[in-house]
Structure formats: C-alpha cells, structure tokens
Swiss-Prot record:
The gene is hemE. GO terms for molecular function: uroporphyrinogen decarboxylase activity. Substrate binds at R27, Q28, A29, G30, R31, D77, Y154, T209, H328. This is Uroporphyrinogen decarboxylase. The keyword Plastid does not apply. Its EC number is 4.1.1.37. HAMAP family: URO_D.
Length: 355
C-alpha cells in the first residue's frame, strides 16, 4: 500500500506528536457542495451513489480538492446494515430514511441474518478499495458504522423519530427482544467494520446518534454495552499500523468516563460540552474529537475563527490528542467558503499549541 503522506489524524488519535491540530468534518462530502449535487444527480439517487464505487470515491474526494482536510471519510450511510438485513430501505423526499418492513416483535428479529460484508455489502467494500486507490496516500481513510442502538431505533421506529416511543416500548416491555436485536447488530457491525479495515480503512468510527435519548442506566445497558462489544471485536492492527477507533454518542457528555473505559482510542464530542471539561475528565485516557457547533459555519469568517480559537484554547497545550471536528454533520446550506475558513483557521491557530 502507498505510504501515507499526511498521517496527522492517525497520530493525534494515538496521542503521538503532531505539528498542528488535524481537522475533518462530519458529512464533509455532502449537499453543501455543488459538485456533490451534480454527482448525485448523475447517480440518480442517494443509494445508487453509495453503490457505485467510482462515484462514491468521487464524492469522498470532492471536499479534499477544496480544503486541506487531514482525513477522508467513506461516503456511505449508517443504514446499509439494516438494508442488507432485508428491511427495505427507501428515502421519502424531505422525510429522510424509511423501512418497508420494520422490526415489531421477536419473530422479526429471529428472521434477520447477519449480512455478508463481501456479499450483500460488497458495494461498501468496493467503495473503500476504490477510495484508498484514488487517495494515493494523501490522507487516511475513515470507515464507519452506526451503533447497534442507533441502527435499532431506525429498524424498530421504521425511520427517523422524535419521541422514540416504539423502541422505548420494546425496551421496557420486551427487553429480551431488544437485546437479541442489539446483539445481532453488534456482531454485524464487528464483521462490517473489520471488512472495511481489511479493504483499506485506516481508522473506524461508530456513530451513536441517538444514545443521548436514553436514561443513564439504559444507555449503559442498551447502547454502551454493545459499543464495548464492538471495540473488543475489532481488528486493531493492519498494514503495520494501529487502527484507531472513535466512539461518538451525540448528547453523550454525561457518560464520557464510561465511553472512554471501553478501550476506544478516541471519544467524539458534540458542542453541548466544554472541551476543557472533557479533557479534564478523560483526556488522560483517550484522544478527543470535536466539537464546534456546525451552525457557527453560518457566521462571518472572523466569528468562525474566534470559535476555533476558543476551542483550541480550551483543549490547551497538550501538543496532541485532539482531532478538530464539528459536533455533528455540516448543514446542507452552509456556504462552502465558510467551511474553508474553518479548516484554515484550525491549521493556522493550532500551530502555537504544538511547539
């Protein structure tokens, strides 16, 4: 494999010295870029874009042509696993993802099998291989999956949800059924991420988008427990390097110590927590990723630079152990030039902290 020209992202995750703070953006390949919209139109629809390795690679690389980002992230969707389990994923315009056959009872859970990462999900692995080839060693490639809990919310609710009543009903009325589903999902995520690593992903991330809707006790039992299982099951060395794993629970600031105790290399932070507090709590154990509110990218350039400076100051002089990111995905109507201001500000303003 080609030697990495810029490995700052991997080094920062492993708390090795870097000369500036590396940065990437959640959803950096996406609808805020006109070139993405053009490629998506060429593909026909979102899943066709995901399933075409050349086009998935093209959109993965688009933000890297505009901005000096320190990592690329696989262009895919967290719902590939439930789709491959036969739930019938489709997208309603303006409404997000839906499933034709949601999970309603134990019989539904019993019916689903573990998808083969080089079978039903081979299109994802083909995209990973294509992206690695097209990156030519410029920056590392991040693979990812949704967390078992987050995948289960979509599978039981039948799509997005505001109140999560269906999955919470299952959690409280039929906990054994939900545990059965989560266990299958954890096994599937382990196979899926390990296949991404074998195909060329140099780091992996688990997105627990909806862990923050749970009580502390339920979070430990129904979300974190299964992410811990995933961390234990992952390949951690490949191509002669450690493969870092990042866990990100949105609205998970209450549980940072528990997340850090899973054995992950890094913990993702959303914008609802002060990074200085997070560092004081878990910075001795793990690297931190985050955590600017994506809405700040609507502001004037000076305000964006100011916010970047505040977060860098909050993390302080550690010299490493921080990957700068947004606290969640970039919004689809952010001007691309503002994203450029953000990336440049991280590089410029972080250098004094790495002397």
């Amino acid at each position: 494999m080609t030697e990495l020209k810029n490995d700052r992202y991997l080094r920062a995750l492993l708390k090795q010295p870097v000369d500036y703070t590396p940065v990437w953006m959640m959803r950096q390949a996406g609808r805020y870029l006109p070139e993405y919209k053009a490629t998506r139109a060429e593909a026909g629809d979102f899943m066709s874009l995901c399933k075409n390795a050349e086009l998935a690679s093209e959109v993965t690389l688009q933000p890297l042509r505009r901005f000096p980002l320190d990592a690329a992230i696989l262009f895919s969707d967290i719902l590939t696993i439930p789709d491959a389990m036969g739930l019938g994923l489709y997208f309603e315009t303006g409404e997000g993802p839906k499933f034709e056959r949601p999970i309603t009872c134990k019989a539904d859970v019993d019916k689903i099998g573990l998808p083969d990462p080089e079978g039903e999900l081979q299109y994802v692995m083909n995209a990973v291989r294509q992206i690695r080839k097209d990156l030519k060693g410029e920056v590392p490639l991040i693979g990812f999956s949704g967390s078992p809990w987050t995948l289960a919310t979509y599978m039981v609710e039948g799509g997005s949800s505001k109140a999560f009543t269906k999955i919470k009903k299952m959690m409280y009325a039929e906990p054994a059924t939900l545990h059965l589903l989560l266990d299958k999902l954890a096994d599937s995520v382990i196979e899926y991420l390990n296949a991404q690593i074998k195909a060329g992903a140099q780091s992996v991330m688990v997105f627990d988008t909806w862990g923050g809707v749970l009580t502390p006790r339920d979070y430990n039992e129904f979300s974190l427990r299964y992410m811990h299982k995933i961390v234990d099951g992952l390949i951690r060395e490949n191509e002669g390097r450690r493969v870092p794993v990042t866990l990100f629970t949105k609205n998970g600031g209450m549980w940072l110590e528990s997340i850090a105790a899973t054995g992950c290399d890094a913990v993702g932070l959303d914008w609802t927590i002060n990074i200085a507090d997070a560092k004081a709590r878990i910075g001795d154990k793990v690297a931190l990723q985050g955590n600017m509110d994506p809405s700040i990218l609507y502001a004037q350039p000076e305000r964006i630079r100011q916010e970047v400076g505040t977060i860098l100051e909050g993390f302080g002089d550690a010299g490493t152990g921080h990957v700068f990111n947004l606290g969640h995905g970039i919004h689809l109507d952010v001007p691309p030039e503002n994203a450029g201001v953000f990336v440049d500000a991280v590089h410029d303003l972080s250098k004094p902290y790495h002397k």
